[in-house]
Amino acid sequence: MLKLFSAFRKDKIWDFDGGIHPPEMKTQSNGTPLRQVPLAPRFVIPLKQHIGAEGELCVSVGDRVLRGQALTRGRGRMLPVHAPTSGTVIAIAPHSTAHPSALAELSVIIDADGEDRWIEREGWSDYRAHSREALIERIHQYGVAGLGGAGFPTGVKLQGGGDKITTLIINAAECEPYITADDRLMQDCAAQIVEGIRILAHILQPREVLIGIEDNKPQAISMLRAVLADAHDISLRVIPTKYPSGGAKQLTRILTGKQVPHGGRSSDIGVLMQNVGTAYAVKRAVIDGEPITERVVTLTGEAVSRPGNVWARLGTPVRHLLNDAGFCPSADQMVIMGGPLMGFTLPWLDVPVVKITNCLLAPSVTEMGAPQEEKSCIRCSACADACPADLLPQQLYWFSKGQQHDKATAHHIADCIECGACAWVCPSNIPLVQYFRQEKAEINAIRLEEKRAAEAKARFEARQARLEREKAARLARHKSAAVQPAAKDQDAIAAALARVKEKQAQATQPVVIQAGSQPDNSAVIAAREARKAQARAKQAAHPMADSAIPGDDPSKAAVEAAIARAKARKQEQQAGSEPAEPVDPRKAAVEAAIARAKARKQEQQAGSEPVEAVDPRKAAVEAAIARAKARKQEQQTGSEPAEAVDPRKAAVEAAIARAKARKQEQQTGSEPAEPIDPRKAAVEAAIARAKARKQEQQAGSEPAEPADPRKAAVAAAIARVQAKKAAQQQVVNED
């Protein structure tokens, strides 16, 4: 009795909520053995036939390839694809693939040569001699992916399982109507499938291995039982026929009673699941050394005359397979890739067969029925009762239609397995699965964009951190590379700084002056006397050199005299703006007479002595001083009324003065005179005038009268005569 209860517990199965029982329609194709299809003349191999990124190309246009030769390199989740036959690569270009929207993907197009030659194959018959990692790498490089419909890379799935897998489940349920590919494969290749299961068990080392198969496959069940008759490491579980019992979460629930959490995976509860077709592909990759180049495809539907299951090479056009099955299309004929519930209609028949293609359904018009019009949801909740994932399809429908992505995510739309049970039972004929697929695609696109933004932000922050680190390192290098002065240099610098500080301290000390004391200037006085003595000695040593220096150019002297006259004229104009008082001619005549008397007396006194040359500079200075004194006297006497000026007398006196000056020049012209520098004379005259002007400004506090123009004219005439005399003397000396 105890053994009976143990056996009962061992073979116990559970049930899942929801599910439907549609017509199976499997007998059309599962009654005939697997057969080979003639090679197509051209193959189109998409680079991406799995979940993940496409691999890196390793062939070029014009290359000749063999069957099983890798067309791409697989790294990470990039699964390689292989040539399905021998031939020549004629193009590498985008081509429409097996997708509901017939998207174009990069593909390698090969023209078959008809020889179908293999690459050199190396099998591992004793696979237990190889490590777990080597087996996983071989499975990955030979292009094995999930053949049940998901297309997830098998090597990546095995690597992710690690040591936490306790139960390995082989999915042989094949619950969708019309599809019999796994059923026929188990009938014809049961031993190879079991061998592949043992390879997977060797890699994962689980505690138990379970095969789940529906009870509507009696021939396959009998074949597996025959192979497993003496095996105790693998258990075969027959489950009731119910759609979708072949789903990963649903089959896990049926065989183990465990529930996969929302948003989780079966590996989270220690379960890993593989398809029977995948197990067969693993056996061929490891033991036979053959990459996956073909798979079993069901050709069924009332539009084909020879339904059945065939070995279809990957990349074979759908049209070629249907024509081999006797395809008789009708008007508005549809062809579905996959089953009637989870498949999609092909837009045209030139798309190729890929790794996830398990069925090509060509129904007649009466078989599928006419398409019905979509109506409004009546909130009947039939979809919720049929959902095997315990979701609320009617709510997800409204969220998807209203673009409410957050609410759809909160209601676990990601857990939808797109089985189509909700759409099957919907009385309003609403294509719920299409809405859910579109909503999930939009959510994935939003998440991908957010991920890219986060990665860009992380790259920016990493770059900023790197720049900061480089800046800090650069500053540290600069500081460490700075030249440090040696000890000797430091001593010299310290001594120099001490001297500077001492001088600064001395400069800042206050000077103390004692009353009654005199400064000691003896050194300065001695230096001045020495310079004077040196100058006198130098002058005595060269007495003749100085006298022999000829005068400057008379033309320059004339120019400078003209400049002096212009300045005097400008000064007269500036002074002419103020009204001038009348000049007293009597005073002017008296002063002119006094000047003549003084000059005559000086000539008489100097008559006995040789006449020296007249120094025009002294004369100009004396004339300026005389004019200043006269001006001052006029200002002092300006309060008295002046008599009327007789212009005739003034003119006579000026003429007499000019005649006397000319006579004096003639008397002194016979003796040689020292050369006179007219420029110096003009400069000294200008200095004298400036001094006189300054004296006038200082005396400007009292009201001043305008200067006597006659005196100025007389002085200017005398200056001109003296300049002319100097020029004549210069000419005589040159001769």
Curated annotation (Swiss-Prot):
GO biological process: electron transport chain
Cofactor note: Binds 2 [4Fe-4S] clusters per subunit.
InterPro entries linked: 4Fe4S_Fe-S-bd (IPR017896), 4Fe4S_Fe_S_CS (IPR017900), Ion_transpt_RnfC/RsxC (IPR010208), Nuo51_FMN-bd (IPR011538), Nuo51_FMN-bd_sf (IPR037225), RnfC_N (IPR026902), Soluble_ligand-bd (IPR019554)
GO-annotated molecular function: 4 iron, 4 sulfur cluster binding; electron transfer activity; metal ion binding
Species, as recorded: Salmonella typhimurium (strain LT2 / SGSC1412 / ATCC 700720)
NCBIfam families: PRK05035.1 (NF003454), rnfC (TIGR01945)
Any matching Pfam family: SLBB
Entry protein name: Ion-translocating oxidoreductase complex subunit C
Assembly notes: The complex is composed of six subunits: RsxA, RsxB, RsxC, RsxD, RsxE and RsxG.
